[in-house]
Amino acid sequence: MTTPLKPLDDAATSFARRHIGPSPRDVAAMLETVNAKSVAELMAQTLPGTIRQAAPLDIGPALSETEALSHMRALAAQNQVFTSLIGQGYAGTIMPAVIQRNILENPAWYTAYTPYQPEISQGRLEALFNFQTMICDLTGLDVANASLLDEGTAAAEAMALAERSARAKTKAFFVDHNVHPQTLTVLRTRAEPLGWKLIVGDPAGDLDGAEVFGGLLQYPDTTGALRDPRAAIAKLHDKGALAILAADLLALTLIASPGELGADIAIGSAQRFGVPMGYGGPHAAYMAVRDALKRSLPGRIVGLSVDSRGAPAYRLALQTREQHIRREKATSNICTAQVLLAVIAAMYAVYHGPAGLKAIARTVHRRTAVLAAGLRKLGFAPANDAFFDTVTVEAGANASSIIARAEAERINLGHNGSRLRIALDETTTADVVEAAWRAFGGELSYADIEAEARDAVPAELKRQRPYLTHPVFHAHRSETEMLRYLRKLADRDLALDRAMIPLGSCTMKLNATTEMIPLTWPEFSSLHPFVPRAQAAGYHAMFADLQDWLCRISGYDAVSLQPNSGAQGEYAGLLAIRGYHAARGEAHRTICLIPSSAHGTNPASAHMVGMEVVVVGCDAGGNVDLADLKAKAEAHSQKLAAIMITYPSTHGVFEEHIRDICDIVHAHGGQVYLDGANLNAQVGLARPGDYGADVSHFNLHKTFCIPHGGGGPGMGPIGVKAHLAPFLPGHPATDGKTAHPVGPVSAAPYGSASILTISYIYMLLMGGEGLTRATEIAILNANYVAARLDAHFPVLYRNERGRIAHECIIDPRLLKQTSGVTVDDIAKRLIDYGFHAPTMSFPVAGTLMIEPTESESKAELDRFCDAMIAIRKEIAEVEQGRFTIEASPLRHAPHTVHDIADDEWSRAYRRSEGCFPAGSSRTDKYWCPVGRVDNVYGDRNLVCSCPPVEDYAQAAE
């Protein structure tokens, strides 16, 4: 660590004690319930002795919250916040304070999970619906998704969509030579393993003889040039190819939309709509398509449906496209997106409205025009007469001295050799423009030059069509109205600030307030990802510590922080394996073994790197079938690339033979990818790198406390053994190289760098001892829940000593035969008790997977278990004939205020039974705003952007 700090001596006031839910007295009572004499005995019964790490985890002593924040201040002081005029897809922006305080800093928003349970996610879903509406309106296209990871990833996903959907059946893709450089490198990474050829050139001439399935044009391009893309789009369409525009959202308030110009797909970043640059992220990217492509659109889509009363209700639509259902046939491996950032961007548009956005855009453009006029006066004519917010000039031999003078003014310019780029944004003042002129050698007055500036948007590219016409973008002009709107939406959702979220494989633990504080400090939030490294010294000191700690925790030798999600970490890890085999002359190794219980991202990721998936069966105990593994490893020995295995397994058990599994794969020349989704059961107790794994990703939004944000952001760094280290994802911004053994998987070299502060503080606060204790209590909590529920809902899988890991699968499938109850009924009934449901039907259809984490107290675990037991009693009443399943409170759940307020009540159970089930609170009850959502209706009547209000007024009444 960069600064030595003394450890905190008083364990009674330590952060670990507040992070971990059960008190010492609770732990003793829970151990008695699970029939273990001590936590140590329980760990010995849970983990195979062959994988236990020998030495205690050592990442330094735990710090107090005050000490940790002081340490972060010292790191922040090492970062230098210059004015960024670099551009290249990242812009300074102003997050309205009402949005910062009431969304970004509000646990009601940032601790929620992905809205798979729509009834308790209506506020978040409405915000995402606003985002989709905003994107559709600005791009002029029909359907948008609810965010992607970053612009580079969005471009790669659009390329893949074009390959699936175009009439042209070639394997070549055209890329405008003036796309953002980081986008081009991500495209190269995605294209190479799939055998797609990139043709990089000038759309004006190089498209003529090219046979391609699609083409990507930047609008405006990375130099700032604003060119009419219609001729290039027409050429692409003539070839049977799809046209993709990477478009700047703020520019689209003034210039013609991609839809008007004939584009099939639009992608880009919503970062400049109120989201800080954060040294690379997190930011919400977007993708919009014409209607014919909607079923091939990657990522999540929010649609409008109806609830059980016929009232409007939002839900995730067209989920059969996604990896958790389609696996290797999915449109993408996307799981985590950028929901929290998409919500911020949408609310930025709600806050400003169309008039406000246009005013911001006009101001930015006007100042850029003034800048250009001054540069001309100084002898530096912009390369293009048409632009929005960026100009590029040829500086020749003066380039280095201009850059140095700009840095003396605390300004960063973009540069490519002797060509200098100056990009303005909503934070740019007249003083900054004058400072930029000084860097170019001139003392000019903004007021004097302003009269010479001219509009630089050509008449044929001026926007004509209206946008953001829905009332939601007009009704919240005052901060009072905006504040109340945000509060209203937050109140509709159930997040960790209200109750435990026991989702298996999701690790919904505490996101402590202290961990979130540095996120908004300008020293972390305001850095452009491509500033000189010396200006980000504090960041790099933090990166070094994080990489060291993750290596100590995992047993690996090197770590890349670049992947922006767990799925992207999988992708990067498999690319490393692929690169390793190719470097050894074994590029023919393309078979990936995947257990049938694997998360859907695993086969989807394998497919994305050109591997062929071979499924390995599981035995009756939920473990990998060793006989089947041996047979398939032998059958594919010459072509075996890897196995992807989750540990502990997705069945919630530490498999006894994990070392044998690794040995079998290694014996046949393969590598072991160990999915780190369940690392929360291993930290301090076992290290994947010690028992045979070669590579893993670490879900920082699970094990290491980055909040889920309602569906993102997330981070998925990967750790590798030394032989794979040369094949970690590279990035030209870190070493200046344009070619790497494995190219970048994210647009920014360190992914969503700013949220790494959260995991970093968590580790500072816990220390090695605290992290280990958290793992032990996570396992104890899970075994406690299993012990309490087993007599009512049998636990499906245990190890040979009767233990589970950090999560368990309960099995109500027999109850469906005896009562007709479904897992959906149980999930919706839990809402009446104030709980989010456990994970449904994964990895075993018809079951529920529960993960309580270490952060939940015994009291909360008991409240959840009591609710589940009460639901079992309600099922028994159906079995005994008190009422049919259709007439039961289970099938009518969740119950809403509309139900309790009905003038008439004709149901077979009492009103109080439905609305206030046994053990639930009447004084602080959570009321979900809608009844059970009709999923079938939503997919058959797809609506993915705000309709005219009058269309739904009657239903709402």
Curated annotation (Swiss-Prot):
Signal sequence interval, chain numbering: none
Top-level EC class as recorded in UniProt: oxidoreductase
Presence of the UniProt keyword Zinc in the record: no
Highest rank taxon of the organism: Bacteria
Modified sites of kind N6-(pyridoxal phosphate)lysine: K702
CDD domains, A to Z: GDC-P (cd00613)
SUPFAM superfamilies given in the database record: PLP-dependent transferases
Keyword set includes Ligase: no
Cofactors demanded by this protein: pyridoxal 5'-phosphate
Residues that span the membrane, as ranges: none
EC number: 1.4.4.2
GO MF assignments: glycine binding; glycine dehydrogenase (decarboxylating) activity; pyridoxal phosphate binding
Catalytic reaction list: N(6)-[(R)-lipoyl]-L-lysyl-[glycine-cleavage complex H protein] + glycine + H(+) = N(6)-[(R)-S(8)-aminomethyldihydrolipoyl]-L-lysyl-[glycine-cleavage complex H protein] + CO2
Keywords, sorted A to Z: Oxidoreductase, Pyridoxal phosphate
Single GO biological process annotation from the record: glycine decarboxylation via glycine cleavage system
InterPro entries on file: GcvP, GDC-P_C, GDC-P_N, GDC_P, PyrdxlP-dep_Trfase, PyrdxlP-dep_Trfase_major, PyrdxlP-dep_Trfase_small
GO cellular component: cytosol; glycine cleavage complex
Function, in words: The glycine cleavage system catalyzes the degradation of glycine. The P protein binds the alpha-amino group of glycine through its pyridoxal phosphate cofactor; CO(2) is released and the remaining methylamine moiety is then transferred to the lipoamide cofactor of the H protein.
Annotated family: Belongs to the GcvP family.
Subunit comment: The glycine cleavage system is composed of four proteins: P, T, L and H.
Protein known as: Glycine dehydrogenase (decarboxylating)
